[in-house]
Amino acid sequence: MNGTLTHLQQLEAESIHIIREVVAEFANPVMLYSIGKDSAVMLHLARKAFFPAPPPFPLLHVDTTWKFREMIQFRDRMAAECGLDLIVHVNEEGVKNGISPFTHGSALYTDVMKTEGLKQALDKYKFDAAFGGARRDEEKSRAKERIFSFRCTNHRWDPKNQRPELWNLYNTRIKPGESIRVFPLSNWTELDVWQYIHLENIPIVPLYYAAVRPVVERDGMLIMVDDERLELKPGEKVQYKSVRFRTLGCYPLTGAVESTADTLPQIIQEMLLTRTSERQGRLIDHDQDGSMEKKKQEGYF
């Protein structure tokens, strides 16, 4: 038997080690479940890490109420089929105040419905460690963040005060009220994620596959018309195009890409040829200079 691990096997082993380390060291961990491809891989790894037992922590979805309908359907189906403990948290104050990406802009909307919503949930359930599916190849602020990312009592991240991580050793010490965000997929690339999904036959939201969908061209992006809340601006018209999504978020803030890739091998082929970041389709990354780093410093994932 060949004892050499493949590249994907090495990544899998590292991620499973990280997940088990968190469960061993923290009293009340949780896994953030955003329903995207990275969350799908992370959940698959967690199930592998503790098989045949279920993962010994719940899933948490911070619901902004603006996710694609197919994402919510997929979330509920996966939780039911896998017998998972799923916590869904909504910032009810934001809903009461009518906060939306259309009327308040992406920066304020993201802060209220995502960042504050996440902090509310972490405080409510007193989680001391939270898994997230962020990867270093996605965006420059994530590239410099540690795998075990320390957060102070108000959930803020200080990029100038990060703990060293040498020889795969992680400092898990925290004081009451402090917490750690943990990123088991830090060293994975977008291509790694797709190849692993193909290899392991991991279920993903159908929006990742190309299909003819109703879209409008807005600010240089193709925004899918997912429900009646999307109001057309003067001069806009609904078009039907073959599109898919490289990244998934709130539908008014997530751009589709024109594509005919409706199978995993075709998506992987696209990844081998593309020269653009998957997050170019996320409006929240571009609503201000240093946008993602500022959001993370305020408590965003």
From Swiss-Prot:
Region spans: Disordered: 279-301
Sorted alphabetically, which keywords does the UniProt record give?
ATP-binding, Nucleotide-binding, Nucleotidyltransferase, Transferase
Q: Which residues form a coiled coil?
A: none
Matching InterPro entries, A to Z?
A: PAPS_reduct_dom, Rossmann-like_a/b/a_fold, SO4_adenylTrfase_ssu, Sulfate_adenylyltrnsfr_sub2
* A Gene Ontology BP annotation from the UniProt entry: sulfate assimilation
Q: At the top level of its lineage, which domain of life is listed?
A: Bacteria
Q: In which pathway does it act?
A: Sulfur metabolism; hydrogen sulfide biosynthesis; sulfite from sulfate: step 1/3
Cited SUPFAM superfamilies: Adenine nucleotide alpha hydrolases-like (SSF52402)
- Please give the catalytic activity noted in the UniProt record: sulfate + ATP + H(+) = adenosine 5'-phosphosulfate + diphosphate
Q: What is its EC number?
A: 2.7.7.4
> What Gene Ontology molecular-function terms does this entry list?
ATP binding; sulfate adenylyltransferase (ATP) activity
Q: What is its EC class?
A: transferase
Q: Which family does it belong to?
A: Belongs to the PAPS reductase family. CysD subfamily.
The record's subunit annotation is: Heterodimer composed of CysD, the smaller subunit, and CysN.
Q: What does this protein do?
A: With CysN forms the ATP sulfurylase (ATPS) that catalyzes the adenylation of sulfate producing adenosine 5'-phosphosulfate (APS) and diphosphate, the first enzymatic step in sulfur assimilation pathway. APS synthesis involves the formation of a high-energy phosphoric-sulfuric acid anhydride bond driven by GTP hydrolysis by CysN coupled to ATP hydrolysis by CysD.
What is this protein's name? Sulfate adenylyltransferase subunit 2
Species this protein is from: Geotalea uraniireducens (strain Rf4) (Geobacter uraniireducens)
